[in-house]
UniProtKB/Swiss-Prot annotation:
UniProt name for this protein: GMP reductase
Activity regulation: Activated by GTP and inhibited by XMP and the IMP analogs allopurinol nucleotide and thiopurinol nucleotide.
Motif Microbody targeting signal per UniProt: ranges: 490-492
GO-annotated cellular components: glycosome; GMP reductase complex
Subunit structure: Homotetramer.
Reaction catalysis annotation: IMP + NH4(+) + NADP(+) = GMP + NADPH + 2 H(+)
Keywords from the named record: CBS domain, Glycosome, GMP biosynthesis, Metal-binding, NAD, NADP, Oxidoreductase, Peroxisome, Potassium, Purine biosynthesis, Purine metabolism, Repeat
Role of this protein: Catalyzes the irreversible NADPH-dependent deamination of GMP to IMP. It functions in the conversion of nucleobase, nucleoside and nucleotide derivatives of G to A nucleotides, and in maintaining the intracellular balance of A and G nucleotides.
Residues passing through the membrane, by range: none
Pfam families in alphabetical order: CBS (PF00571), IMPDH (PF00478)
Binding residues annotated for K(+), in chain numbering: G314, G316, C319, R322
Catalytic residue positions: C319 (thioimidate intermediate), T321 (proton donor/acceptor)
């Protein structure tokens, strides 16, 4: 009876289709002047507030590479083996960097002919402009540098040691923490195109080349780590084996871990966050936790040490948690409640799910989210790993929820634990479907960011932070929602 008696005072839950942002006087003269930079977590900064969802039909290494190059980040799904997920992390890290970890090397006793072969002089893919000359391939002590120009007039039998520029006349560095800007300044002042980075015993650790720096500086939107590599996140669960997975992912180079379960406000998730924050193998990266939908959940995860929060219980296009479990909070209200607590502690929030348009991104961020996580909107792109099918004569890609039957059966198959219990115990909270093939990911991101820039300017703001201070919402009726879209025409 107490529950019945409380019905008149039940809180009201709103989602993106229930509201609009009220336009305000804007000082913005060009959308290009709008700043879309934000934080993913306490220490991870992004150029655009878009995160690729950790779904096995949305984000693997190809999606993550494009996301980082465009200023966002991809979170690699965990529905694979530890080795497979770590391999994806390494692929992202190798995709773009100003620190070459495995530069081509040659011995001083090699001939010009051998050097030409190593340099790939014919210009085939994989060719390099210089070789690092080392005393042997084990100790890797640098003896000098051999460039293509050193070989032009040499005879085929000439030895590398007679042609190379000795290390005593080579610009080198022992600063393994050197930044992109510092490396560029060294090249400018010393007039060199290569900088070998050496260890305490003169051993070759890395190589920085002018061509790699030019590639990186040509794309200023990319989100990079301190070594100039693309940033990437990885999802983990809360089981015992996920402690091993987390350590392996950090070792492989993951910049952030996302503890990702359907009900993030649980002791399992809270305990996992605490364990990761005290484990020396994992506490050097930020930990994001979710999914949650209440202020109480936000506070508990922040108290556990979470560096970021993932908000959303049931709003996704392939999620049926609200139907199966009867639980959830409409997404706009969930974001507002969680963000109100998170802002007090300086912890960024991700609005995960329910986003159908660029306008929804604007509403989520105005409500307090620092980033939005997209699944459906990015599925179907060329980079997305979903399988391509032909449906009614049109190409489509599969998309599926990670709490669904198919995703969990595939995971069990990979882990070689597919037995009758897996089928009997599984209660799906996700479905499978298809989305049209959409082409490359980058143009889609540009359209979404363009819409966000417009939304920020309509709020009379220059940045996300300013928008969150100034934004005002108005509730609208069903008729208002219908009026908001195209109407009274036949679409072409």
């Amino acid at each position: 009876m107490a529950a019945l008696g409380s019905l008149p005072t039940l809180p009201e839950g709103l989602t993106y289709d229930d509201v609009l942002l009220i336009p305000q006087r804007s000082p913005v003269r060009s959308r290009k002047a709008v700043n879309t930079s934000t934080r993913l977590s306490r220490n991870i900064h992004l150029k655009i507030p878009i995160v690729a969802s950790n779904m096995d039909t949305v984000c693997e290494d190809k999606t993550a590479v494009t996301m980082a190059r465009e200023g966002g980040i991809g979170i690699l799904h965990r529905f694979c083996s530890i080795e497979e997920q770590c391999a994806m992390v390494r692929k992202v890290k190798r995709a773009q960097s100003f620190l070459i970890e495995d530069p081509r090397m040659i011995l001083p006793s090699a001939t010009k002919a051998e050097a030409l072969e190593e340099l790939n002089w014919s210009g085939r893919k994989g060719g390099v402009s210089c070789l690092m000359v080392v005393d042997d391939f084990t100790s890797r002590r640098l003896c000098g540098v051999l460039s293509k120009s050193d070989l032009i007039f040499a005879t085929d039998s000439a030895l590398v040691e007679t042609l190379m520029t000795p290390v005593s006349r080579t610009v080198v560095s022992t600063n393994t923490a050197i930044t992109l800007e510092e490396a560029r300044e060294v090249m400018r002042t010393k007039r060199t195109s290569n900088i070998p980075l050496l260890g305490p015993k003169g051993e070759l650790l890395y190589l920085i080349t002018q061509s790699d720096i030019l590639k990186l500086t040509g794309n200023r939107n990319a989100t990079l780590d301190s070594r100039g590599r693309l940033i990437v996140g990885a999802a983990i669960g809360v089981k015992k084996e996920d402690h091993k997975r987390a350590a392996a992912l950090v070792d492989a180079g993951a910049d952030v871990l996302v503890v990702d379960i359907a009900h993030g406000h649980s002791d399992l998730c809270i305990d996992m966050v605490k364990a990761l924050k005290v484990n020396p193998l994992t506490n050097k990266v930020d930990i994001i936790a979710g999914n949650i939908a209440t202020a109480e959940a936000a506070q508990d995860l922040i108290d556990a040490g979470a560096d970021g929060l993932k908000i959303g219980v049931g709003p996704g296009s392939i999620c049926i948690t609200r139907l199966v479990a009867g639980s959830g909070v409409p997404q706009l209200s969930a974001v507002m409640d969680c963000a109100r607590v998170a802002k007090k502690h300086g912890v960024p929030c991700i609005a995960d799910g329910g986003v159908k348009t660029a306008g929804d991104i604007c509403k989520a961020i105005a409500a307090g989210a620092d980033t939005v996580m997209l699944g459906n909107m990015l599925a179907g792109t060329d980079e997305a790993p979903g399988r391509v099918l032909v449906k009614d004569g049109k190409k489509v890609k599969i998309i599926r929820g990670m709490a669904g039957f198919g995703a969990n059966i595939s995971k069990a198959e990979r882990e070689k634990r597919l037995d009758e219990d897996v089928f009997n115990d599984l209660v799906p909270e996700g479905v499978e479907g298809s989305v049209p093939c959409k082409g490359p990911l980058a143009p889609i991101l540009k359209q979404l960011v363009g819409g966000l820039r417009s939304g920020i300017s309509y709020c009379g703001s220059h940045s996300i932070a300013d928008m969150q201070q100034r934004a005002r919402f108005v509730r609208m009726s069903g008729a208002g929602l219908r009026e908001s879209g195209s109407h009274d025409i036949s679409k072409l």
